[in-house]
Amino acid sequence: MMYSRFRTVAGNLNCAAKRLSSSSTTTTTTSAPSELQQNLAALRARLAMESPSLSDFISLKSDNAYSVEVGTKKKPLPKPKWMKESIPGGEKYVQIKKKLRELKLHTVCEEAKCPNLGECWSGGETGTATATIMILGDTCTRGCRFCNVKTSRTPPPPDPDEPTNVAEAIASWGLDYVVITSVDRDDLPDQGSGHFTETVQKLKALKPSMLIEALVPDFRGNAECVEKVSKSGLDVFAHNIETVEELQSAVRDHRANFKQSLDVLMMAKEYAPAGTLTKTSIMLGCGETPDQIVKTMEKVRAAGVDVMTFGQHMRPSKRHMPVSEYITPEAFEKYQTLGMEMGFRYVASGPMVRSSYKAGEFYIKSMIDSDRAASS
């Protein structure tokens, strides 16, 4: 059976991973909604019956085929060659940085020290410069162990002029696709959903043709907040699960959890207009096992998510969660292959891929344009 072979492949991945422990950490989870269970069962049945072979999914036999060790605290090993960061530069990079400073706008690109900042801001291969704008201030109410954004229980109140400033700035840059994200604002009655909605609506009013991806927090699972943002006019509703189900409490803030994030993605699919894509992202190299990754992918796909991205966890400072291992480009490629077999419409997977990834945005834009052309 295909699914049996599929599981064998995941088992082989586990054997290839050098830093996997003999007993993985598990957590007790709440039973998933019946709809999710039905979707998961249907996905597994389809994988068991389909004919395309997955024998090439993972055949990583050498010691370094799946990952490379990071060394010890006293004797760290150098990063592998594929993790070398490019230096930011170029005329467009300078222009965007200057404009952001003038308008006092924040980008997650800088706050989170994204390794792709140079490529995205300078235009990269597609020639279109992009920046992921962070609204609701630069201070988060949560403290996830992987994130470099500063935190506070009582951050400054949101700037009431920010939605207008952000919309006008982005509209003037001549972009076709933009990502708007935010810090968590548990201190606000509506978790910041109203501010998010206003920003999207103002930008769409100024430039209706622009495609907008909203990378949102979980709003503590509040359905009204999710519905409000889902119906704001966005084209892609994104919310990141960040890591496998078993490592949620070790990686994310205690107010976040796997089920809550899946529920948010499912609600967005229900509330958003037809044709709106849902998207999520996961980091590798946090101590997860390949089998846990596969199971997480199954549940995400069963929740109706259209797009999934995989990237390497990179420690922003010594006070943050350490990297457990560097996953090889070959292993990332295999996860992409499996994701497409599962039925995701698009999967971006690579060491330097982040949830707001320029190449992925370019592909998603093409996909949305194609969908709309076909339906017109």
Swiss-Prot record:
Q: Which reaction does it catalyse?
A: [[Fe-S] cluster scaffold protein carrying a second [4Fe-4S](2+) cluster] + N(6)-octanoyl-L-lysyl-[protein] + 2 oxidized [2Fe-2S]-[ferredoxin] + 2 S-adenosyl-L-methionine + 4 H(+) = [[Fe-S] cluster scaffold protein] + N(6)-[(R)-dihydrolipoyl]-L-lysyl-[protein] + 4 Fe(3+) + 2 hydrogen sulfide + 2 5'-deoxyadenosine + 2 L-methionine + 2 reduced [2Fe-2S]-[ferredoxin]
Q: Which GO terms describe its molecular function?
A: 4 iron, 4 sulfur cluster binding; lipoate synthase activity; metal ion binding
Principal subcellular localization: mitochondrion
A Pfam family this protein belongs to?
Radical_SAM
In the UniProt record, does the keyword DNA damage occur? Answer: no
Q: What class of enzyme is it?
A: transferase
Instruction: Give the UniProt subcellular location, in the record's own words.
Output: Mitochondrion
What keywords appear on the UniProt entry? 4Fe-4S, Iron, Iron-sulfur, Metal-binding, Mitochondrion, S-adenosyl-L-methionine, Transferase
Query: What's an example GO cellular component term for this entry?
Result: mitochondrion
Q: Which residues bind [4Fe-4S] cluster 2?
A: 140, 144, 147
| Family membership | Belongs to the radical SAM superfamily. Lipoyl synthase family.
Name the UniProt record assigns to this protein: Lipoyl synthase 2, mitochondrial
Write down the species: Pisum sativum
Q: What is the lineage of its organism?
A: Eukaryota, Viridiplantae, Streptophyta, Embryophyta, Tracheophyta
Q: Which gene encodes it?
A: LIP1-2
